[in-house]
From Swiss-Prot:
Induction: Expressed only on infection of host cells. It holds the Pfam family Exo_endo_phos. Produces a CDT (cytolethal distending toxin) activity, which causes DNA damage in intoxicated cells. This damage induces G2/M cell cycle arrest, chromatin fragmentation, cell distention and nucleus enlargement. It is found in: Secreted. It comes from the Bacteria. This is Cytolethal distending toxin subunit B homolog. Residues 1-22 form the signal peptide. One of its GO terms (molecular function) is toxin activity.
Length: 269
């Protein structure tokens, strides 16, 4: 009789520890500028994006810039998020990577901000359904919004800074910091990844000018992330996030765009 009780107690303790220690570094995260455009986008979603998400090695969360339209096989759930005063909607879809009899569902959170060409839209694909969805208003009239999903106390966001040097890159980080400084948000850990169109060194200098360098850490790969050279795709993590120093950025070799995907994975202890 003692063994079953001991086993049950052990399971409860392990479950509690697992829940209590859940943090951003527990997730396999990736960002990718898809260079989306019409028919080619559908192919990239069904081939390249699917590869990044599938199997045990697949990422848990994929941030997509220039996402184009969602794949035609994605099914709208009816969940429509449009925060008051922001005016930028996000729609939730389910996307089955498996078969009808053996489903493998992912959740797509898609923001159709490019109502004309439908090319430079933003999307986040998640293995888990989001508890919350966030939209941070654009930093300038020309800028794009920051969108994000919340899984428990962890928030994953993506952004696409303006071309020609990412003049709004630092403002994107500042707006994100200020949003999560609100009293009702301070308990959350957040991670922002995307195409900043600016080198990580330059962004770090910008953050130092604004005295924000101690609030966040920039996580960037050491290899160029764009075909023309330059490291433009990387992440920014709030320093209060548990185990934030354990996460490293690595360039993925897949090339079906003018940008490489960049993965953020926990370093081995």
């Amino acid at each position: 009789m003692k063994k079953p009780v001991f086993f049950l107690l052990t399971m409860i303790i392990c479950s509690y520890i697992s829940f209590a220690c859940a943090n951003i570094s527990d997730y396999k995260v990736m960002t990718w500028n898809l260079q989306g455009s019409s028919a080619s986008t559908e192919s990239k979603w069904n081939v390249n994006v699917r590869q990044l998400l599938s199997g045990t090695a697949g990422v848990d969360i994929l941030m997509v810039q220039e996402a184009g339209a969602v794949p035609t096989s994605a099914v709208p759930t009816g969940r429509h998020i449009q925060p008051f005063g922001v005016g930028i909607p996000i729609d939730e879809y389910t996307w089955n990577l498996g078969t009808t009899s053996r489903q493998d569902i992912r959740y797509i959170y898609h923001s159709a901000i490019d109502v004309g060409a439908r090319r430079v839209n933003l999307a986040i694909v998640s293995r888990q359904r989001a508890d919350n969805v966030y939209v941070l208003r654009p930093t300038t009239v020309a800028s794009r919004p920051v969108i994000g999903i919340g899984l428990g106390n962890d928030v994953f966001l993506t952004a696409h800074a303006l071309a020609s040097g990412g003049p709004d890159a630092a403002a994107i980080v500042r707006v994100t910091i200020n949003f999560f400084r609100q009293p009702q948000m301070r308990h959350l850990s957040w991670f922002l990844a995307g195409d900043f169109n600016r080198s990580p060194d330059r962004l770090e200098n910008d953050l130092m000018t604004e005295h924000l360098e101690r609030v966040v850490a920039v996580l960037a790969p050491t290899e160029p992330t764009q075909i023309g050279g330059g490291i433009l795709d990387y992440g920014v993590i709030v320093d209060r996030a548990p185990y934030s120093q354990r996460v490293e950025a690595l360039r993925n070799p897949q090339l079906a765009s003018d940008h490489y995907p960049v993965a953020f994975l926990a370093r081995s202890c």
